[in-house]
Amino acid sequence: MTTLTAQQIACVYAWLAQLFSRELDDEQLTQIASAQMAEWFSLLKSEPPLAAAVNELENCIATLTVRDDARLELAADFCGLFLMTDKQAALPYASAYKQDEQEIKRLLVEAGMETSGNFNEPADHLAIYLELLSHLHFSLGEGTVPARRIDSLRQKTLTALWQWLPEFVVRCRQYDSFGFYAALSQLLLVLVESDHQNR
C-alpha cells in the first residue's frame, strides 16, 4: 500500500477487529454513518485496491441508516453469522476452517502479547488476528523494535490468516442477506491481500 501510513493501517485493523468481535451498539452505529467516518472512508479509497470494497461498505451503511430497528437487525445478523452452528454461518475462528488454532497463540507469544480476559472468545478468533496485525503496524510506525523482526511476524500472521480468510469471506457473502458483514469481510480481504503483497 502506498498512501496509507503504518499507523493508519493499524487503525483499520483495530476498527475491523472491534466490528467483528461484538455486535454494534447505538454509538457505533451512529459513528459508522458520521461525517468523520465518511472522511476516513475517503482516505481509504485513495488506496486503489480498497476503493471498490469501501464503496460497497458505504452503500450498505447508507441502506442501514434507513433500515427499521437497524441495531437490532444488525445484532441478529451478527448472531446468525458468527455465533450459530457452522451450517449456515461464517464462524470467525481459524479452527472452523481446519486450521491450527495454536498458530495464533505462537504468534502472540512471539509478539509478546496475550489475549485479554475481557474477550470471552477462543484465541483463534478473527479479532485476535486483527488486533495482532494492528499492534504490529503500530510497532512499525514507532520504530522501537527492529522493522525486520516486526515485518517477519507480520508476514507470518498474514499468511496464517490467509489460510482461512477467503473461505470465511465466501461464507459471509453467502449467508449475510443484508450484506453489512459481507461488505466488511470483503474490505478485510482486500486489506489483508494488499498488506501481504506489500513485503
UniProtKB/Swiss-Prot annotation:
Coiled coil location: none
Please give the GO cellular component terms listed in this UniProt entry. Answer: cytoplasm
> In the UniProt record, does the keyword Transcription occur?
no
- Which UniProt key words apply to this protein? Chaperone, Cytoplasm
Q: Which Gene3D superfamilies match?
A: 1.20.120.1820, HscB, C-terminal domain (1.20.1280.20)
Per the record, the domain of life is Bacteria
Q: Which GO terms describe its biological process?
A: protein complex oligomerization; protein folding
Subcellular location, record wording: Cytoplasm
Primary role: Involved in the biogenesis of TorA. Acts on TorA before the insertion of the molybdenum cofactor and, as a result, probably favors a conformation of the apoenzyme that is competent for acquiring the cofactor.
Annotated HAMAP family = TorD
The family annotation for this protein states: Belongs to the TorD/DmsD family. TorD subfamily.
Name of this chain's protein: Chaperone protein TorD
Originating organism: Escherichia coli O139:H28 (strain E24377A / ETEC)
